[in-house]
Amino acid sequence: MIEIRHQTVLGAGTVRSAYDAFYRQRKLLMRDSFYLWLLELAQPQAGELLVDVACGNGRLVELAARRGINALGFDLSFEGIQAAAAETQGASWVVGNGQTIPFPDACADIVLSIGSLEHYDQPTQGARELARILRPRGRAVILLPNAFGLLGNMRYVLRHGEVFDDDQPQQRYATRRTWEAMLRRGGLAVEGVVPFNEFNAPRTPRDTVWTVTRPQKFVKAAIGRVTPLNWANHFVFLCGRAAQPDPAHYPMLAYP
C-alpha cells in the first residue's frame, strides 16, 4: 500500500479543517454520467434508503434525489455539506466522521463510498462502519484506487517518476487483493468487482456533447475495455454484509 500525507494533516491542523479549506477553494466533481453509472450498479428500489458516506459536494445524492430515491449525504466537511445542501432539494444531509457514523446498526439499504476510504486515518474502521450501518441484505458500492492502474498510476509514473497526488490531505493506493482484504476485515463480503478506467458512456445530453468533442476519450475507452481487471485505474467493489469480519492476517495490509 502506498500512502501520501500532506503537511495539512502532519502539522497542527486536522483532516476536517484541511477538507473545509479544500472545499472553500474548489469542488470535487466528476461528470454526471459517472454518478448515474454508480446508481445503476447500486440498483436502488422504491422505499429503500441510500446513504452516500463521504459524499463531498453531494452530486450523487442530488442526482439520486431528483430520481425520487430516498437519499442521504454524509461527510466530514461542513463546507462540503453546506454547498451540497444549498443546491439540492429532497435529500438529507449529516456532518460527521465516517469512522464513527452516528447512525443505528442496519439502517441503510444501500451504502456508497466513492473514492473516500483511501483518505481516512483508519480505512479499515471506515469499512467496519459501512458494514455496521448496512442492512443484512443491503448493498454497498465502494470505489477505491489501484496502485497499478495502466491508464492511471503506471502511466503517470512513467512520465513523472511518482504516483499521482490529487492534493487531498491524505491518499492511499493499493492492489485489488489488498483492498479486498481490508473490506473483508471490516465485515463486508465482496460479491463482485467492476473496473473503472476514467470513462463512462454518456448518460446525459451535456455529457454526450462533452464526450464527442474530445475524441481522445474514445481511445481511452477502447484501451479500458481490453485492460485486465488488475490494471484498472479504480475498482468498484460490490459488497454485501458478511456474517462476520475476516480477521486473517494479510501481509500487504498494514492497518488493523
Where are these regions (language model features)?
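A short hydrophobic/small-residue beta-strand
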Residues: A71, A140-V141
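A short glycine-rich, Lys/Arg-flanked "PGG" loop and its adjoining helix->strand segment in the class I
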Residues: T124-R139
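Conserved class I S-adenosyl-L-methionine
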Residues: V141-V163
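A C-terminal cap/extension of S-adenosyl-L-methionine-dependent methyltransferases
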Residues: R155-G161, A181, G192-P256
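Acceptor-substrate binding/catalytic loop of class I
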Residues: H160-T178
